[in-house]
Amino acid sequence: SQRTVDAHSKKDWRLGRASAGNIIPSTTGAAKAVGKIIPELNGKLTGMSFRIPTLDISVVDVTFRLAQETTYEEIKAAVREASEGELKGILGYTEEEVVSSDFIGDARTCIFDAKAGIALNNKFVKLIAWYDNEWGYSNKMLDLIAHMATVKEIKKVKHLTYCN
């Protein structure tokens, strides 16, 4: 949906601008979707996207105000432990000096970039995670199909369909 040269866009003036030479602020439905999936977060987060001239990798930049004090080192240790344990293959962890193209073809949901995050203090942190929004997403759809194949019954509740 992104134009390669400046042209008229009915939807959004900025999206009509040339993609190859611009970073274009845009909207995202991700925060709204998270609120639907995790009701406790509904209305507590927002977000935006930037259309940038890159092949297919995206990055998430999330700023948290923490309920209790913790150090950035403790956060890194917890993410690393999860990436090597219960979330192995889903959550990645890196301390390498990475750029977007390093994640092309990565099937994991996201890869935490330990060197890119920062802590303003022990209650306010910024975390960065990369993901392949084409290959990674396709792999998550395959995971979902495999899971659905094991489910005996599908129930509908309000707006959500869930497996039982």
Protein language model annotation of sequence segments:
Residues 104-164:
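NAD(P)-dependent Rossmann-like dehydrogenase/reductase catalytic/cofactor-binding core
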